[in-house]
């Protein structure tokens, strides 16, 4: 099997701040991808731990909500080490990290991992909207060849593994075996690709042309250009991971290309991310009283469709596990994606969501 693995960050971020992770291990014939959920706390560390534990396992270990509890102490150590380093650097926003630790905020990630049992068979393990996509003889023959615990439901509320055993995560992982052939191509992807290919397959597109574009990738620059192209075609803007696996008649795995793992710089300066969240929660130049009484903005809810969208999401999924800022981000991203707002309209929608959530508290 030949493997190529690529990462690309959200358009507004730096590569080092990407919260997706992948691992390819040629000895255990294992490949894993995890999507750190950005509304959680330091999710990239959690995604990295689960990917590494799975791919390096020689005893067939795979994640379940119970088994990932063994990784919780490791995540706690990484979290505390990061907090210590930020304080030593006199980061003015380091208190936000300590506050998050005191509030027992945790990390969450989706996961897809495969382990080759032979050149003709693999075992897969999936939780959330990260997916395994199988092209049979160069074609995506139906939505059924996109394997995810959501099976076509790619929204902003995926199943996940949680770093806090008291929360326990969400959803039931899928674990199964499947036959493959040397005429197949396997993709392990995070949700932007899951959603993109699902919509194409649902409309009857066999995606053969898209697969050819994928097979031509040989560098990070090639991949970034492809992601930008597909975003212009409707793929949503988020951290995007793509691992391409081409089976053959060999029982070994060779890595033809892989992007640098951001985990190599696991204690990079995240000041910009922390500051960004702080500024979104506390807009400059206005006190909370002024924001509540600001009549220069449009009405809090100016269409019943928007109000129904938020109410339905809250009634269906609850809010406790996400927290205030998490819900701001989830709802904003979901509604913007739904309505394809841009520019100043995006800022207005974010204000509307903030005000509406404040009124519901």
What kind of region is each of these model predictions?
Residues 1-18, 86-99, 145-150:
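Short glycine- and acidic-rich boundary segments immediately preceding or forming the N-terminal edge
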Residues 1-59, 130, 166, 175-177, ...:
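N-terminal entry segment of metal-dependent catalytic domains or homologous docking segments
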Residues 15-25, 103-119, 123, 147-198:
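Acidic loop->beta-strand submotif enriched in PP2C/PPM serine/threonine phosphatases
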Residues 26-27, 116-120, 135-139, 247-248:
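Short acidic-glycine loop/turn motifs at beta-strand connectors
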Residues 31-35, 125-127, 187-189:
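Short hydrophobic beta-strand that contains or immediately precedes a catalytic carboxylate
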Residues 52-90, 201, 205-231:
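Helix-loop-helix
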Residues 64-135, 169-180, 234:
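Catalytic core of PPM/PP2C metal-dependent serine/threonine phosphatase domains
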Residues 163-316, 324-361:
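C-terminal catalytic subdomain
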């Amino acid at each position: 099997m030949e493997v190529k693995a690529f990462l690309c960050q959200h358009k507004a971020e730096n590569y080092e701040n990407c919260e997706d992770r992948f691992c390819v291990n040629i000895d255990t014939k294992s490949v894993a991808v995890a999507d750190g959920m950005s509304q959680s706390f330091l999710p990239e560390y959690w995604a990295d731990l689960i990917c590494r534990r799975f791919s390096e396992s020689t005893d067939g270990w795979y994640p379940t909500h119970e088994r990932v509890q063994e990784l919780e102490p490791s995540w706690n150590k990484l979290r505390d080490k990061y907090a210590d380093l930020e304080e030593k650097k006199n980061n003015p926003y380091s208190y936000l990290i300590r506050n998050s630790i005191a509030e027992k905020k945790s990390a969450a990630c989706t996961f897809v991992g495969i382990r080759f049992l032979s050149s003709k068979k693999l075992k897969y393990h999936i939780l959330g909207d990260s997916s395994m996509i199988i092209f049979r003889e160069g074609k995506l023959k139906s939505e059924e060849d996109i394997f995810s615990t959501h099976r076509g439901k790619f929204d902003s509320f995926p199943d996940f593994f949680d770093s806090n055993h008291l929360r326990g995560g969400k959803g039931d992982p899928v674990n199964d075996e499947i036959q493959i052939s040397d005429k197949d191509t396997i993709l392990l992807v995070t949700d932007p690709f899951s959603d993109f290919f699902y919509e194409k397959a649902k409309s009857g597109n066999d995606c053969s042309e898209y697969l050819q574009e994928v097979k031509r990738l040989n560098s990070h620059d090639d991949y970034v250009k492809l992601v930008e192209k597909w975003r212009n075609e409707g793929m949503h803007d988020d951290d995007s991971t793509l691992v391409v696996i081409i089976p053959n008649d060999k029982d070994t795995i060779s890595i033809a290309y892989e992007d640098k793992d951001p985990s190599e710089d696991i204690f990079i300066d995240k000041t910009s991310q922390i500051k960004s969240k702080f500024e979104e929660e506390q807009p400059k130049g206005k006190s909370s009283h002024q924001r509540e009484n600001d009549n220069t903005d449009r009405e809090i809810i100016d269409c019943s469709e928007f109000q129904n969208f938020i109410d339905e999401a809250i009634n269906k999924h609850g809010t406790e596990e996400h927290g205030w800022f998490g819900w701001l981000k989830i709802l904003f991203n979901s509604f913007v994606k739904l309505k394809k707002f841009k520019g100043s309209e995006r800022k207005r929608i974010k204000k509307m969501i903030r005000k509406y959530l404040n009124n519901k508290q």
